[in-house]
Swiss-Prot record:
The keyword Methyltransferase applies. It comes from Helicobacter acinonychis (strain Sheeba). It is found in: Cytoplasm. The gene is rsmH. GO terms for cellular component: cytoplasm. This is Ribosomal RNA small subunit methyltransferase H. The lineage of its organism: Bacteria, Pseudomonadati, Campylobacterota, Epsilonproteobacteria, Campylobacterales.
């Protein structure tokens, strides 16, 4: 277990604890429990909270249970996608929910596991958070039509040469299907001379988002989160697509006027804000944290306080 403590470093841990410092009692939902790092630290400080942890990854759940042993009876783990499970928890617990955390990153345990296919050197081409899901990276890269590949590379990777990359992938797989992540990564490296970032980075991001429905799930969650009352919502994102969704959702939550933009005059009474944004700019990791955990460098945390 000490090996897990050393391997997995919860991103922006102190900042998360600070965000939820006002909490004393009630239900806390960790929508992306992972290995339980954030939840363990929070329960250590707030023993009167009741934790609901949600995760798709059953292996991660087992590790989280082991790490949360000291809090037996204070937590409950739900398996599945966080949008669906959060909606169910919201219907059950309503205004008892006082805090919600969403950490959209992939854990080091998943990234470093060669059998999961998340890293460039994996001898697998999978990328599923939920290993019971039917769609995996191999199906995407070896069977999606060129138009579908272009769309996910453009929409989920913001790749400038999305047409060219999709064309080369389809051309190559016709001769020999991609067998693992290393095979795909090496092929992508042969197409690009970009030295700033690994040529496979954005393609892998796009495929992972597609396989796990990451943006759709985040959109669904943010829509349901509007129903929270008196709760603190904290979301940690790791790329601009996620952060833009969170930023825009929080702006909409904080809007007083909901009149049509074409209206010359407000007729809605101008008091529809659901709460306030507590982070005018996103909180990012300190240089010290990045030094000890390079994977934290792209993290951005936004916090919203809902009115009772």
């Amino acid at each position: 277990m000490q090996e897990i403590e050393n391997l997995h470093k919860s991103v922006l841990l102190q900042e998360v604890l600070q965000a939820f410092a006002p909490l004393e009692k009630g239900v806390f939902i960790d929508c992306t429990l992972g290995l339980g790092g954030h939840s363990k630290a929070l329960l250590s400080q707030k023993p009167h909270l009741k934790l609901i942890g949600i995760d798709k990854d059953k292996h991660a759940q087992e590790i989280a249970k082991e790490r949360l042993k000291a809090f037996e009876g204070c937590y409950h783990i739900l398996s599945g996608g966080f949008a669906k499970r959060f909606k169910e928890a919201l219907e059950t617990h309503g205004e008892q929910i006082k805090g919600v955390l969403v950490d959209l990153g992939v854990s080091s345990l998943q990234l470093d596991d060669d059998n999961r296919g998340f890293n460039f050197h994996s001898h697998a081409l999978d990328m599923r958070m939920d290993l019971e899901s039917e769609l995996n990276a191999q199906k995407v890269i070896n069977s999606y039509c060129i138009v579908a590949l272009e769309k996910i590379f453009k929409d989920y990777g913001a790749i400038k040469e999305y047409k060219k990359i999709a064309h080369h992938i389809v051309e190559r797989r016709a001769k020999k299907p991609f067998k693992d992540a290393k095979d795909l990564s090496d092929f992508l490296s042969s197409l690009s001379k970009n030295k700033k970032i690994h040529p496979a980075t954005l393609v892998f991001q796009a495929i992972r988002i597609e396989v796990n429905r990451e943006l759709e799930e985040l959109k669904e969650f943010l829509q349901d989160a509007m129903k929270l009352k008196g709760a603190i919502l904290c979301v940690i994102s790791f790329h601009s697509l996620e952060d833009a969704l969170v930023k825009n959702a929080f702006k909409n939550y904080a809007k007083n006027c909901i009149c049509d933009a074409l209206n010359f005059k407000c007729t809605c009474s101008n008091n529809h804000a659901l709460g306030e944004i507590l982070t005018k700019k996103p909180i990012t990791p300190s240089l010290e944290e990045i030094k000890h955990n390079r994977r934290s460098r792209s993290a951005k945390m936004r916090v919203f306080q809902f009115k009772p």
